[in-house]
Structure formats: C-alpha cells, structure tokens
Amino acid sequence: MKPSIHSLTHQTMQEWVLEQGEKKFRADQIWEWLYRKRVQSFEEMTNLSKDLIAKLNDQFVVNPLKQGIVQESADGTVKYLFELPDGMLIETVLMRQHYGLSVCVTTQVGCNIGCTFCASGLIKKQRDLNNGEIVAQIMLVQKYFAERGQDERVNHIVVMGIGEPFDNYNNVLNFFRTINDDKGMAIGARHITVSTSGLAHKIRNFADEGVQVNLAVSLHAPNNELRSSIMKINRAFPIEKLFAAIEYYIETTNRRVTFEYIMLNEVNDGVEQALELAELLKNIKKLSYVNLIPYTPVSEHDQYSRSPKERVLAFYDTLKKKGVNCVVRQEHGTDIDAAYGQLRSNTMKRDRQKAVAAVNP
C-alpha cells in the first residue's frame, strides 16, 4: 500500500527530491501544487518532468481517503465519514465559527481511553493514523467546498476527533509541521488546538517542543474518585500527576491551557463540583480557561443525560464568582449525528445489521 504524499513534511519532501537526483526547488513546486493549488493527481503538476511524475506515481498516492457519508447541519456544520485504504472508517467535522472555518480531525481509528460518556470509544483503537491521513482530512474538506464553487478556506484546526492525539504523538507533530508551513496551508500555530485526555508525560514533552499550538485538556471532573469513574485514564494519570505536568507546561511556555468539562446531569455538574474545580485551578487561574460542554446523549451510554440549563448556569456562575475564566461552548450540528464518533458508530451498526439480515433473511 503506497503512502500518501501528504505524509511528507516540507523537509522530508526536500530530502526525497534530492534522493531522486532532482534539484531542491522541485520540492517547493510539488508543495505548491498540493497545498496552494490542491491538485488531486500528480499529472496535474505541469511544471514537473514526466520522469519525476512517474516516480511520484510509483511511490505515493495523493489522496489516501475515500469520501463516504456527508451530513450537513442547518447551522452549516458538516460531518464527513472517510474510508481509509484498509477499509476502516474515520470522522471529520467542519464547523462554521464567527472567526472562520474550523475543522476537527481524527488521529486514530477507535480509542482506548475509555471515557464512559463518549461515542468515540465505543470501538477500541485499531491503529494510529499517519501524518498523511490526518492532513488528507483537511484537503478533502477543502475539495468539498471547491466542488461546490465555495471559495472558503479552512483557517482553524482542532485535534479533538476520534482517538487520543498524544498517543499518536510523532504523527500529530508532523501534521502540525505540515499544515503550519508557510509555503503550504500556512495555518498559524495559534489557530491550532490539540486536546489530550491527560497523558501527563506527553504534556511535558509537548511543553519542551517549543511549538505555539494551543493545548486543551479533557478534565471533566475535579477529583480523582469522580474522574476515575468516568475516565479510566485517570487511574494511570491521576489529577496530582496530571496537574504537575500542566503546571510544568505553563511554567515552560507561559501559555494558557483550556480545560474541557462535559456537563453530565447530577454526575459532575453540581455547585460542589464547581467549587472543587475552582480550588483545583487556583494556582494557575490566570492561564487557565474552562470550556463547559453541553452533553450530546449517546444511546450506548444511557446512564448519562444532559444537564438542564439551570444546572449549567449555576456551575458557570460559581466558577465566575471564584474568578475562573469560563464559557459554555456553542453547540454545532445538533440536528445530525452530533456526538463525535456517532456517525461512524451508527454506520458500522447499520452495516452489521445488513450483514446479519443477508445471512438470516
């Protein structure tokens, strides 16, 4: 199976071109065709020699993904189901924000983190995506708009799709290098956010990388007992270890950390939990931000329900009174398979039902 050309960073593209006996500037030409002109085949690269095009075709594919189901919401949110070369399925979501187009990408097929409220973890991790498969998600979103005559450019990226990004650390870092490169997509590092469920050692590594990409942490509970009950990752990286890593990140980078907090009715959404959260953040309050997330129900996790508006507001008000910067996140795509992983999970469920029906008519 040939890799995607998108799996090369600009530096490794230059190295490959030199290995083929070509001049280094050919890498810039290929890069421009891929990321500025967004071609879908090597034959469209008209300023390259036939010999170089043949080498590209022999060693790479342009697009490793096949577009499947597309769901478009009334609010402009678009959810894509993509098929990988090995037949596995992933999801990508485009959201329209007041500041532009934001794409949420997937980094793994399935997830092993085991959050008990999340649709993404319904199917265990099968494998990591390589850099090219992550980049290709953005390229296909751009292609989707180009085919409709919509001259819109993706300018924000959130790495919050299926999987734990820091469990696929090197591929995710190369993804950042590719999309941030000023000769390519030129998406500013501060327009990119990566979210982790709390791999403390990787947070420390990330602090030392010196990149300007934003960090978000999926916290969802203010104490170990509650967090371990809804996120098994907390047993490996309890809050004390996690926050030591977060404090190291802040001290090293002087950058703000966003804390994701999903609102589960009468589970983690009480005023007492808000007070605990404020206490937990008191030493890093100036460089922390809490994102309160309304829960999207998942049929397989029917033990949870959405927090009523009054409980969300009481939680929000409590944090505000304690001086914690926070917001209730705007919802997107509530009229489609909204929770991350639902489109993929529901599609696979329907496929299994069809297979069973075919065997037992």
Swiss-Prot record:
InterPro entries listed in its UniProt record? Aldolase_TIM, Methyltransferase_A, RlmN_N, RNA_MTrfase_RlmN, rRNA_lsu_MTrfase_RlmN/Cfr, rSAM
**Classification via Pfam families:** Radical_SAM, RlmN_N
Q: Can you tell me which residues form the catalytic site?
A: E91 (proton acceptor)
GO BP terms: namely: rRNA base methylation; tRNA methylation
Enumerate the PROSITE patterns for this protein: RADICAL_SAM
Keyword presence, Ion transport: no
**Alphabetical UniProt keywords:** 4Fe-4S, Cytoplasm, Iron, Iron-sulfur, Metal-binding, Methyltransferase, rRNA processing, S-adenosyl-L-methionine, Transferase, tRNA processing
Q: What catalytic activity is recorded? A: adenosine(2503) in 23S rRNA + 2 reduced [2Fe-2S]-[ferredoxin] + 2 S-adenosyl-L-methionine = 2-methyladenosine(2503) in 23S rRNA + 5'-deoxyadenosine + L-methionine + 2 oxidized [2Fe-2S]-[ferredoxin] + S-adenosyl-L-homocysteine; adenosine(37) in tRNA + 2 reduced [2Fe-2S]-[ferredoxin] + 2 S-adenosyl-L-methionine = 2-methyladenosine(37) in tRNA + 5'-deoxyadenosine + L-methionine + 2 oxidized [2Fe-2S]-[ferredoxin] + S-adenosyl-L-homocysteine
Function statement: Specifically methylates position 2 of adenine 2503 in 23S rRNA and position 2 of adenine 37 in tRNAs.
This protein is called: Putative dual-specificity RNA methyltransferase RlmN
| The organism of origin for this protein | Streptococcus pneumoniae (strain CGSP14)
Name of encoding gene: rlmN
